[in-house]
């Protein structure tokens, strides 16, 4: 791509102003087990103070895309509340908005039946906005991306559809839509979640996988959605139905997601399992993590709870409040306890003589005295009784909690017999 197109922020801004972003945020994320029993996957807390939905929303705002629809369905109350509380700063008088678009059976007596159907059921609302381009995003991935560069690429290629792609190990590619491109990056073959993924010609141990990021010319998208809705037996899914049908006849291109400075593949995480969720949070504790949450040029926006600074109290030989190699959010109190290599969300209290190691502690958790917790994810609102031991004997843990294939213990209020009636 010409450097001038990448460098011209005015050109990119003009494109982003003509773009409507639709974030698909209705999924449960069942592989996260009880972590999504009472919330949609995009509403799952991440990174000490955020929710997963904040990442695609921040990418939109930082890229200059200020017209956004969030399509919701599964247990969306906490997600909707989060967006209402934290994302009301856009200027409606300037045409900026973040609209929540719940499944409403607008066109037929059924809920969203697939990714394409979710957009199709909102065609009347989209027509009212009259965008030139429509960007479709997954609401459950963690990454930072300037969508303006992808829009510029889409226009330069005179594409009907552009798909964001990344390189993944061949063994992992079965979980993705996999594509094959020619030398011009035009997609010639696309298979959703293949049992035998085709490798990349220059990297036989990797495959080119879809990120679930699509840019459509609006008229083209409408045409394909209406055609798909009238097709008997369709799954009404972009990856399974629409994309394989259009790649031969229309101009469909792949956009490689790379770091603008280094040219290597940029950070992207699915966090779709308990293991991957724990690992992605643990990565943030490192000295120089790949995902830089301290980048002032690309902030991650979110709802800011009004909490006091974290506090560490007691400094006796046998009772010292301390945290080492950890991230500790506002409102936390480490009272004569030890926290090591862990991530604590807001309003967590760790009481005296307890130890937390290699763990992710979600908001509003109280850990009683004399507890030992290691390699665990503790869900929001849990009250851990005194003398509780988690993560040291997985056989015992399996009797009470969920234990992942890699030995991460997930503890939720329901596991503890604590029925919480608040928004998670």
UniProtKB/Swiss-Prot annotation:
InterPro entries from the UniProt entry: ADP-Glc_PPase, ADP_Glu_pyroP_CS, GlgC_bac, GlmU/GlgC-like_hexapep, NTP_transferase_dom, Nucleotide-diphossugar_trans, Trimer_LpxA-like_sf
Presence of keyword Nucleotide-binding: yes
EC number: 2.7.7.27
Record-level GO BP terms: glycogen biosynthetic process
GO molecular function, one term: glucose-1-phosphate adenylyltransferase activity
Top EC class of this enzyme: transferase
Keywords, ordered alphabetically: ATP-binding, Carbohydrate metabolism, Glycogen biosynthesis, Glycogen metabolism, Nucleotide-binding, Nucleotidyltransferase, Transferase
Reaction it catalyzes: alpha-D-glucose 1-phosphate + ATP + H(+) = ADP-alpha-D-glucose + diphosphate
The UniProt record lists the keyword Transferase: yes
Pathway: Glycan biosynthesis; glycogen biosynthesis
Entry-linked Pfam families: Hexapep_GlmU, NTP_transferase
Family, similarity comment: Belongs to the bacterial/plant glucose-1-phosphate adenylyltransferase family.
HAMAP family named among the record's database cross-references: GlgC
Free-text function comment from the UniProt entry: Involved in the biosynthesis of ADP-glucose, a building block required for the elongation reactions to produce glycogen. Catalyzes the reaction between ATP and alpha-D-glucose 1-phosphate (G1P) to produce pyrophosphate and ADP-Glc.
PANTHER family: GLUCOSE-1-PHOSPHATE ADENYLYLTRANSFERASE (PTHR43523:SF2), GLUCOSE-1-PHOSPHATE ADENYLYLTRANSFERASE-RELATED (PTHR43523)
Subunit comment: Homotetramer.
Designated name of the protein: Glucose-1-phosphate adenylyltransferase
Primary gene name: glgC
């Amino acid at each position: 791509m010409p450097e001038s197109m990448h460098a011209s922020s005015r050109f990119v801004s003009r494109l982003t102003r003509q773009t409507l972003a639709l974030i698909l945020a209705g999924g449960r994320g069942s592989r996260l087990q009880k972590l999504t029993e009472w919330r949609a996957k995009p509403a799952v807390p991440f990174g000490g103070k955020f929710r997963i939905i904040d990442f695609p929303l921040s990418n939109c705002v930082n890229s200059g895309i200020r017209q956004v629809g969030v399509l919701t369905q599964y247990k969306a109350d906490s997600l909707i509340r989060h967006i209402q509380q934290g994302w009301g700063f856009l200027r409606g008088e300037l045409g900026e908005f973040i609209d929540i678009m719940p499944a409403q059976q607008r066109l037929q007596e059924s809920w969203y039946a697939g990714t394409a159907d979710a957009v199709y059921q909102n065609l009347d609302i989209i027509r009212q906005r009259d965008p030139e381009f429509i960007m479709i995003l997954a609401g459950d991935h963690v990454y930072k991306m300037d969508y303006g560069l992808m829009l510029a690429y889409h226009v330069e290629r005179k594409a009907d559809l552009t798909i964001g792609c990344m390189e993944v190990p061949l063994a992992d590619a079965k979980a993705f839509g996999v594509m094959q491109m020619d030398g011009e990056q035009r997609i010639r073959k696309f298979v959703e979640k293949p049992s035998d993924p085709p490798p990349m010609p220059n990297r036989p141990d990797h495959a080119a996988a879809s990120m679930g990021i699509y840019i459509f010319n609006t008229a083209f998208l409408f045409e394909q959605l209406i055609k798909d809705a009238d097709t008997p037996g369709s799954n009404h899914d972009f990856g399974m139905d629409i994309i394989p049908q259009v790649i031969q006849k229309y101009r469909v291109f792949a956009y490689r997601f790379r770091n603008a400075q280094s040219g290597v593949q940029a950070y992207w995480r699915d966090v779709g399992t308990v293991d991957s969720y724990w690992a992605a949070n643990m990565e943030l504790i490192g000295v120089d993590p790949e995902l830089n949450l301290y980048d002032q040029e690309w902030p991650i926006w979110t709802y800011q709870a009004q909490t006091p600074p974290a506090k560490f109290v007691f400094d006796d030989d046998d009772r010292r409040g301390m945290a080492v190699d950890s991230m500790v959010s506002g409102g936390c109190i480490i009272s004569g306890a030890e926290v090591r290599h862990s991530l604590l969300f807001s309003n967590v209290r760790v009481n005296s003589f307890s130890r937390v190691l290699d763990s992710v502690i979600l908001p509003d958790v109280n850990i009683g005295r004399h507890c030992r917790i290691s390699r665990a994810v503790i869900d929001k609102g849990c009250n851990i009784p005194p003398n509780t031991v988690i993560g040291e004997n997985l056989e015992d843990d399996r009797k009470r909690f969920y234990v992942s294939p890699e030995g991460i213990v997930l503890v939720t209020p329901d596991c503890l017999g604590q029925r919480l009636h608040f928004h998670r």
